[in-house]
Structures are given as structure tokens and as C-alpha cells.
């Protein structure tokens, strides 16, 4: 009985999942935390710098795979036919001529610029804005039109340009740059050299300005005009061809076969971003909006090519042929913070308890237990009295805004407070804010002629916090399907591995047998939906007003009168 393994590289940990290909049964799973990341190494949150050491990925992946394989019988281990990989993104790293991430070399071992630049690293805001301006020059090709019209600081070229400008040693040593979701399959298959490495359609199309209509990447002249420093250090084009994730990049290398105790015949499928594979694991069909909810959200929608036609959807994070399911257009959107907003509020409320624990060491364990109950208690308190009449209006931009219209300069805003606002009400305002952000994304599609036939949610928050999900359901004012599996991203990676290994002919056939089921479907409550509608309109008004205060300084000075007028809304 064929078994596929999915690897899901998240922000904090990597998950390995073994799945029986015939039934979709989840046989074994393991989660390994990144040790250096957990200690806060190589990060500077105050300056929005978040880096992952490649050894965190390698060590945690090996431990997770060995743990899963140890849970299988000898017969089952012999039945492993493929390994699939998904990761956060855009999370690129500089590599040398052999495809080694520079931080694996002694001279760069502790240099954050030689590591993977995590998706939520926002150090490249100015570089991203420069790319957007260049794309929009009159009379020139707009290379941003298939990625929503705005290039983000979270993406490939902005990060490359920022590091290249900042660190000449890394710039000199880098032969290329590679996304994490492409590098791990190459590592497992022994194909890391830039000329051998297969670039995934998903990462290239959504984050690297790659599109078939202009022959791949933008021309060298585009990068020269952006900043000649890129072409001075990197050979153009960095790559030309891309592959969908169902195409194998190779088989398990002799080194990794020995380390894992598996056959070298195990197929290694192409890589893609976590949420794209999560949508596949959830069994998503065309025009279903799939919300992968965690610290942030990634929203995925696939559409038939003919229905999309020549239309380009503005304000999203890209529309790419084959980025999710081959032969369909994959569209990506998302919220830069979701669960992170609740965690922030928990830290705010927990600060006095931390001080008390320092003063009273004997009470430390009791206080720690109380801290863990803060958010569940707030959720319950607001659910028991979900009054919306005096609910604070909050803008969910605590980590910038990804969609609609990416802008990482934005900050969170809390309005409509009074002396009667208590902790449950403020927490309710945060819940509503994340739901409003979800609706803004849905409307970004529907208002541009892309139908949303149904909405699905997956992830830990989706399954474990019905209060938050019901608020989303009421704000969206449509049914909300909760997907059963907690491991849809890893499951999606396993589905791609099964197709790469030849167990199934294509992704839809594999989904029929392996994808997760819908656990429950929430229905909107008409009265709450009507009340939320009024708050959503206020959320939109504040969004227009507040955004004026986070314009780049030059533009802000130019538009100051407009900013003041906006505040009178």
C-alpha cells in the first residue's frame, strides 16, 4: 500500500505527515521546532527583521522525518513512494555555486543576511515600493499586473535588492537566490546547484515577477533601471523555466536515503507555498475561497482559465497558471496578521502577571497557568455577551496589510474607545477586525468579477475556536465550511508526492481519495450579520482615513490636505 510523506515548513516548526495514498488515512505525524529561531536568534523584531538559519530547517526536517518513519512498521517504510514539500513564502536565501545557502559556510555562519529571509521580514519596504513605481511607469510593460499591481516587501526581488545593498560580502558570494520551497526538494534530491535546481511555478509566478507572456522574468534592462547592483552580482536571467509541483524534481539522493533509511527510488515532488498546498489538502474546487488561518492568513482561490480570460485582478498577491492545481489559475490573497493579533493582546494583558511572577517566584507556575487561560476566558466572556453596540472598531493592520493592495507601512488602529470599554469588548473588537479583513479579501475578488461560490477555513484556529469562526461567518454573511484535518498543508504536500510518484495521474484524482473532508458548516446568524454590516462600513471608512497617515514621507507631504479631509468622514 503506497505511502506519501508531506513536509510543511512553517514559521516556527516543520511538520512531517505520512499518508496512505489509497485512503488518505493519516498514519503518523511529527512536529519539530526550529531551535535557533525558538531562542530568537538572528531576528530583530523592532526593525522587522526575521531570519531562519538553514540548519534549523535541515536538523528539524531530519528529526521530523525520522520520528514519522519510526512510527511506521518496516513494511510501511518500504511502501513510502514520495515526499512532497511546502513552505512559507516568499522565504528566499542566497546560495553559492553548489547551491549551499551561504550561512552553511563558516564565514557566513552567523550572518543574518546569509540566511533565509522569512516571509514576514519587512526590511525591504523601500525596495518594494521602488519595484512598484518602476512597474507603473507610463509607456512601459507593467510586470506587476499578474501579481495584483503592487510588489510587496515580503517578496523575492525586494529582499534580494535589500540584502545586496546592505551586505557586499553576501552580494559577492551569492551565485543565485532560491526560495525555501524550491531549495528543500533540491536538497533531498541532490540537485541544489542553480543550473540543476527546478524552480516552482508557485513561487516564481506569485513572488518573482515570472510570467509566460514576457518569456519568464523581466528583462535585464528592468533590473538595471531598478538598481544596476543586481545585475552586477547575479547572472541574468536567474532562471527561465518553471514547473508545477506535481512534476518530480528527482528522487531521494544517496545521502538522504542513507540518513532516513529509505529507498533512493522515492520520488521528490516539486515545492510550493504552504497555503497553496493547503488548499489542495482541503479538497478545494474551482471558485472556493480557502482561508488557511494561523498567525496570519493566506487565502487561495482557483479558477478555470476560460472564466478568468484576460482579466487581471488588482490588489491580490498574484494569479498564476498552475500555482495551486495544474491547468487552473491559482489566486492568492491574505491577511498579514490574524492569530498574531490575539497573541499580541494576550501579551499585553499578561505583562502584569509576568511582573508578579518575578516578584513572587513561589507563584510562578500558578501565574503561568493563569496566563494560558487569558484568551480562552476573554473569548468565552465575549461570546456570552456579544454586544456590538459599543464595540471598538479596529483595523487589522498590526503587521501591515497584504490584501487588498499590499502596504507594509500600515499599522494597527483601535478606535471608538470609551471609559466603559472593558477587556472582553476590546477583544471582541479584535475578533471583528480579523473578520472584517477576511471580508475585504472576499470582496476584492467578487467586485472584480471573480465569483466566490463557497468559503472554507482550515487550521488550528478554524477548528478550535468556533466563536471566532462564527464571527467570520456572520461578517461574511455566508456559510463557512470548517475543514476536518489539522494538517491540510502537509496533506496537500503528500498529495503532490503521490502524483509525482505515479500513484495517481493528476491532482484532482488524488484529491478524491486523499483530501480532507469538511467537518462542519457554520451558518450566518441574520441579526448578528446585520449588526456587523454597520460596523464593517465604519471599518471601511476608518481604513480610508487611516491609510493617509502611513504614506511614504514625500507623498504624505504632497497629500496632506487630502489626509485632513479624509479624517472628517
Curated annotation (Swiss-Prot):
Keywords: Arabinose catabolism, ATP-binding, Carbohydrate metabolism, Kinase, Nucleotide-binding, Transferase. One of its GO terms (biological process) is L-arabinose catabolic process to xylulose 5-phosphate. It catalyses: D-ribulose + ATP = D-ribulose 5-phosphate + ADP + H(+); L-ribulose + ATP = L-ribulose 5-phosphate + ADP + H(+). GO terms for molecular function: ATP binding; D-ribulokinase activity; ribulokinase activity. Transmembrane segments: none annotated. Pfam families: FGGY_C. Its EC number is 2.7.1.16. It comes from the Bacteria. GO terms for cellular component: cytoplasm. The keyword Transferase applies. Pathway: Carbohydrate degradation; L-arabinose degradation via L-ribulose; D-xylulose 5-phosphate from L-arabinose (bacterial route): step 2/3. The keyword Cell inner membrane does not apply. Belongs to the ribulokinase family. PANTHER family: FGGY CARBOHYDRATE KINASE DOMAIN-CONTAINING PROTEIN, RIBULOKINASE. This is Ribulokinase. It comes from Klebsiella pneumoniae subsp. pneumoniae (strain ATCC 700721 / MGH 78578). The gene is araB.
Amino acid at each position: 500500500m503506497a505511502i506519501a510523506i508531506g513536509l510543511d515548513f512553517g514559521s516556527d516548526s516543520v511538520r512531517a505527515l505520512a499518508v496512505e495514498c489509497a485512503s488518505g488515512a493519516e498514519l503518523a505525524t511529527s512536529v519539530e521546532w526550529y531551535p535557533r529561531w525558538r531562542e530568537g536568534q538572528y531576528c530583530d523584531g523592532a526593525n522587522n527583521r526575521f531570519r531562519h538559519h538553514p540548519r534549523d530547517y535541515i536538523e528539524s526536517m531530519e528529526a521530523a522525518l525520522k520520528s514519522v518513519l519510526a512510527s511506521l512498521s518496516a513494511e510501511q517504510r518500504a511502501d513510502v513512494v514520495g515526499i512532497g514539500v511546502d513552505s512559507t513564502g516568499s522565504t528566499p536565501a542566497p546560495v553559492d555555486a553548489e547551491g549551499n545557502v551561504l550561512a552553511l559556510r563558516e564565514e557566513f555562519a552567523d550572518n543574518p543576511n546569509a540566511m533565509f529571509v522569512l516571509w514576514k521580514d519587512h526590511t525591504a519596504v523601500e525596495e518594494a515600493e521602488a519595484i512598484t513605481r518602476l512597474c507603473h511607469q507610463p509607456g512601459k510593460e507593467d510586470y506587476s499586473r499578474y501579481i495584483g499591481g503592487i510588489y510587496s516587501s515580503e517578496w523575492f526581488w525586494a529582499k534580494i535588492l535589500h540584502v545586496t545593498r546592505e551586505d557586499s560580502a553576501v552580494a559577492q558570494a551569492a551565485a543565485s537566490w532560491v526560495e525555501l520551497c524550491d531549495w528543500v526538494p533540491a536538497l533531498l534530491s541532490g540537485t541544489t546547484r542553480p543550473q540543476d535546481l527546478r524552480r516552482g511555478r508557485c513561487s516564481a509566478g506569485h513572488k518573482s515577477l515570472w510570467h509566460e507572456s514576457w518569456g519568464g522574468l523581466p528583462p535585464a534592462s528592468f533590473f538595471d533601471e531598478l538598481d544596476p547592483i543586481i545585475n552586477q552580482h547575479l547572472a541574468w536571467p536567474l532562471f527561465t523555466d518553471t514547473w508545477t509541483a506535481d512534476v518530480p524534481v528527482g528522487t531521494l539522493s544517496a545521502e538522504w536515503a542513507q540518513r532516513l533509511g529509505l529507498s533512493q527510488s522515492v520520488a521528490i515532488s516539486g515545492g510550493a507555498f504552504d497555503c497553496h498546498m493547503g488548499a489542495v489538502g482541503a479538497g478545494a474546487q474551482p471558485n472556493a475561497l480557502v482561508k488557511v488561518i494561523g498567525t496570519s492568513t493566506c487565502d487561495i482561490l482557483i479558477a478555470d482559465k476560460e472564466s478568468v480570460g484576460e482579466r487581471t485582478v488588482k490588489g491580490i498577491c498574484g494569479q498564476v497558471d498552475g500555482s495551486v492545481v495544474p491547468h487552473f489559475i491559482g489566486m492568492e490573497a491574505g491577511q498579514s496578521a490574524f492569530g498574531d493579533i490575539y497573541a499580541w493582546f494576550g501579551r499585553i494583558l499578561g505583562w502584569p502577571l509576568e511582573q508578579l511572577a518575578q516578584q513572587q517566584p513561589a507563584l510562578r507556575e500558578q501565574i503561568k497557568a493563569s496566563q494560558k487561560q487569558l484568551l480562552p476566558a476573554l473569548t468565552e466572556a465575549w461570546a456570552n455577551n456579544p454586544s456590538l453596540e459599543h464595540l471598538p472598531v479596529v483595523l487589522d493592520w498590526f503587521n501591515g496589510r497584504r490584501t487588498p493592495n499590499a502596504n507594509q507601512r500600515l499599522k494597527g488602529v483601535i478606535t471608538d474607545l470609551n471609559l466603559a470599554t472593558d477587556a472582553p469588548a476590546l477583544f471582541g473588537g479584535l475578533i471583528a477586525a480579523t473578520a472584517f479583513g477576511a471580508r475585504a479579501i472576499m470582496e476584492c475578488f467578487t467586485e472584480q468579477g471573480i465569483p466566490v461560490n463557497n468559503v472554507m477555513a482550515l487550521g488550528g484556529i478554524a477548528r478550535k475556536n468556533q466563536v471566532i469562526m462564527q464571527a467570520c461567518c456572520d461578517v461574511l454573511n455566508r456559510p463557512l465550511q470548517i475543514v476536518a484535518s489539522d494538517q491540510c498543508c502537509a496533506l496537500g504536500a503528500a498529495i503532490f508526492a503521490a502524483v509525482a510518484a505515479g500513484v495517481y495521474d493528476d491532482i484532482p484524482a488524488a484529491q478524491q481519495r486523499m483530501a480532507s473532508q469538511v467537518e462542519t458548516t457554520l451558518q450566518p446568524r441574520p441579526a448578528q450579520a446585520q449588526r456587523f454590516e454597520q460596523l464593517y462600513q465604519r471599518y471601511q471608512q476608518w481604513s480610508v482615513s487611516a491609510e493617509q497617515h502611513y504614506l511614504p514621507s514625500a507623498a504624505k507631504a504632497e497629500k496632506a490636505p487630502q489626509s485632513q479631509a479624509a479624517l472628517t468622514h
